[in-house]
Every structure is written in structure tokens, then in C-alpha cells.
Amino acid sequence: MNWLPEAEAEEHLKGILSGDFFDGLTNHLDCPLEDIDSTNGEGDWVARFQDLEPPPLDMFPALPSDLTSCPKGAARVRIPNNMIPALKQSCSSEALSGINSTPHQSSAPPDIKVSYLFQSLTPVSVLENSYGSLSTQNSGSQRLAFPVKGMRSKRRRPTTVRLSYLFPFEPRKSTPGESVTEGYYSSEQHAKKKRKIHLITHTESSTLESSKSDGIVRICTHCETITTPQWRQGPSGPKTLCNACGVRFKSGRLVPEYRPASSPTFIPSVHSNSHRKIIEMRKKDDEFDTSMIRSDIQKVKQGRKKMV
């Protein structure tokens, strides 16, 4: 899209070529031409340009395609020739102001500034930076996620009890679903039962041996039992009652209806080993005549005495 018509553009070009434009430019710049030596200056400039070396290619990276490429539908802007010197002057003034302000703002070396200005961020560098930041975060999180364990205590483990040492001659019989503790407690209960049976048999044998050694077979005068762990004093004298009857006699509760459950003369309808039940039975005897039952009991006692 043209800013000026073609006729006006041609007139401007003619004015520039005629030299009027450059005369006005020199008047505005006010640069005396007498100070410039035309003969020596040209030779020095040529020698200096010959000594210059071309810059390395790595210093200037390739420009992005967005700046170099131009869309097809977009129209190119044409700048008139009379505005080019004014643009050059404004650019040079901005550059000079930037140079004057940079030393106060930053004190970095020029090489670092140049490399920083021409440094371009590629996708690979962006990925590397992001990967580095993620790795530092992951390393920090891993340090926090795995704390250091403390020292282990030197506590001794509980010793397991071996049943083979306790009962070496008894084979252990356990069901598939039985645990170790259940088997241990069951074996202990079995051993206690055996001990009780052994103690009872031992007391019975000791009483029989003592009666045999005395030459007299002892019988309780109240319940007519033969076996007892201890003979006690009764109304007939010392060692005439069994242990249960002797305890009752000592407390004053020995009645005819009392019999221990192990007595051979124990009849459930007549006798009992509980004092409360005996009182209830006596109340019933007052209501019903129990003389016949008592006579039968006396006959049984007499028959037993004859047999002994």
C-alpha cells in the first residue's frame, strides 16, 4: 500500500537527486566540512577495513522463521526516500542513549552481555531446564520420604517351652487344628488329673497299710466308710470317725441324716451331705411318718456289723 501517489513520489526523488535534500541536512547537522581531511581519511579507512576479520558464524544464531517469513496476503510497506535520513538519525540517538545508560545499570563484562543477548531458547534447552528442576525436587522428596531407622533394641526373644523335656515318656497327640498353646494346656490338665488320682490311691493305700499294721480294720461309726484320708475323734473316742463326719462332729452339726456321698450307706431319699437339705427333710418327717424307713436302716446296719 503506497503512502504517496506516484507523481508526488517522483517529485521527491528528483529533489533528492538534485541535492537540495542534502543541503538542508547539512544545515541542520551543522558539521563543518573543513575539519575533515579527504585525502588521508580515505586511506586510513581502507587500511582499517582490510585488517578486520569476519565474525564467527556461531556468534549470530539463525533468526526465527516468524521474523523472516511474510504472509502471502500481507502487503509490503514502502517507506518514502525522504524519511530514511530522519529514521537513521532517530535510531542513532536511541543507540547513543542506550550506551550511556548501560554502564550505570549493569557492570557485567561485554562478552557475557553479547552472549546473553544472542542466546536463544530452543525446545531442547527448555526440556533440559525443566528436567533439572524436576530432578532437584525429586531428590528432595526422596530424602524426606525415606527416614533413617533407629537402632534396633537387643531384646531377647521369648524362649519356647519344649514339651518333650517336661513329659519325655508321654507321646504328644494333637489334632491338625489344635494350636501349640491348647496342646500345652491340655497336657498340663492331664498331668494334674494323673497327680490327683495318684494322691487318692496313695492315701487309700496308706490308710489300708496303717489299718493292717495296727491289725484292726477301721470303720467310721457314723457312715460306715472304710477309706478316708484322715481319722478323727468322735463320741466313741479318737480315730472313730472319718474325715467328713469328724469335721461335722467338731462343729456340732453331725446328725443321723448326714452322710457323705462316698458312704456305702448313702440313700438319697433319706440322707444328704447338705445341712440345709437335712433341715427341709426333717420338716417333711414331721408331716409324714418315717419310722418304717428308719427301722429298715437299723436292720441294714446290724447286718453289716455281723458281716464284719
Curated annotation (Swiss-Prot):
The record's listing under Pfam families reads: GATA (PF00320)
What is the source species? Arabidopsis thaliana (Mouse-ear cress)
Q: What keywords appear on the UniProt entry? A: Activator, DNA-binding, Metal-binding, Nucleus, Transcription, Transcription regulation, Zinc, Zinc-finger
Zinc fingers (GATA-type), as residue ranges, are: 214-268
Q: What name does this protein carry?
A: GATA transcription factor 10
Q: Which PANTHER family match?
A: GATA TRANSCRIPTION FACTOR, GATA TRANSCRIPTION FACTOR 10-RELATED
| Gene3D superfamilies named in the record | Erythroid Transcription Factor GATA-1, subunit A
Q: What is the lineage of its organism?
A: Eukaryota, Viridiplantae, Streptophyta, Embryophyta, Tracheophyta
- Function as written in the Swiss-Prot or TrEMBL entry: Transcriptional activator that specifically binds 5'-GATA-3' or 5'-GAT-3' motifs within gene promoters. May be involved in the regulation of some light-responsive genes.
